[in-house]
């Protein structure tokens, strides 16, 4: 069956997902750029803020490192490293401290055994495997007939659903890390009240990128279900 652009209205679902992702990405980049220009009153760098937050939470086995790139910051629970990017590591801006605090939030989650983080970590190998073979299985299934066709399509969709679940479980993980960041920055005095307000705006914008990503995945899954069900009805 031919699913060309002019005959397949479900491309609209993909387009909506792309637009949502682009808007969210643009918003977080703009907000980060704005608060990257504002020097924090404390004058702490992102690295110093991260190290202090970790110590405040009794975490002494996490290494704060530098990583190249822009907004490539992340916490790796496998080797307990907290990597801060070029605009964060040595920067004294409000944005840098906010991002560093957010990544520390993930380190604290790991330290405390935060369940959603553990679930997300367990899904990683399945998602990595599924992302490689889900679409090939579905495409092969669409060109076949009979029970084998349905079997391949169902397995492909199931693997894609795992990827959707991964994006959904990421939402509470990221939101919780941001809440921890805002709380510690306010309670520690590392940032003034108006500076914490800037961090809230930045982390809220960052959270929307994960919301947009999850929405895009759900829309792709919906499109898959519509196309495969339509194909089965025509068999």
Briefly describe each language-model feature range.
Residues 1-5, 25-130, 165-235:
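Polar-ligand-bearing catalytic/cofactor-coordination segments
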Residues 17-23, 141, 159-170:
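Alpha-helical transmembrane segments of multi-pass membrane proteins
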Residues 10-34:
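N-terminal signal-anchor transmembrane alpha helix
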Residues 18-24, 152-154, 196:
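Short hydrophobic/aromatic-rich motifs at helix boundaries and adjacent loops
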Residues 124-149:
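Post-HExxH zinc-binding segment in Zn-dependent metallohydrolases
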Residues 14, 131, 135, 157-160, ...:
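Residues within membrane-spanning alpha-helices of integral membrane proteins
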Residues 6-14, 148-158:
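Hydrophobic alpha-helical transmembrane segments
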Residues 2, 140-155, 227-235:
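Membrane-interfacial helix-loop-helix connectors in multipass membrane proteins
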């Amino acid at each position: 069956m031919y699913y060309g652009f002019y005959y397949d209205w479900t491309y609209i679902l993909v387009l909506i997902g792309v637009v949502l992702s682009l808007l969210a990405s643009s918003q977080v980049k703009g907000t980060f750029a704005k608060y990257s220009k504002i020097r924090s009153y404390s004058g702490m760098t992102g690295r110093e803020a991260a190290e202090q937050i970790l110590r405040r939470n009794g975490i002494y086995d996490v290494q704060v490192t530098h990583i190249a790139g822009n907004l490539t910051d992340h916490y790796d629970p496998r080797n307990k490293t907290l990597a801060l990017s070029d605009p964060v590591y040595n920067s004294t801006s409000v944005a840098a401290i906010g991002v560093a605090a957010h990544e520390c939030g993930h380190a604290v989650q790991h330290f405390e055994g935060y369940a959603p983080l553990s679930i997300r970590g367990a899904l990683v190998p399945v998602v990595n495997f599924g992302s490689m073979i889900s679409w090939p299985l579905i495409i092969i299934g669409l060109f076949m007939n009979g029970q084998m066709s349905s079997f391949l399509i169902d397995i492909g969709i199931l693997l894609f659903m795992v990827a959707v679940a991964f994006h959904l479980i990421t939402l509470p993980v990221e939101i919780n890390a941001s809440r921890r960041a805002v709380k510690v920055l306010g309670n520690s005095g590392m940032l003034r009240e108006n500076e914490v307000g800037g961090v809230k705006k930045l982390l809220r914008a960052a959270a929307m990128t994960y919301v947009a990503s999850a929405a895009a995945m759900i829309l792709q899954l919906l499109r898959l279900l519509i196309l495969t069900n339509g194909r089965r009805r025509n068999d």
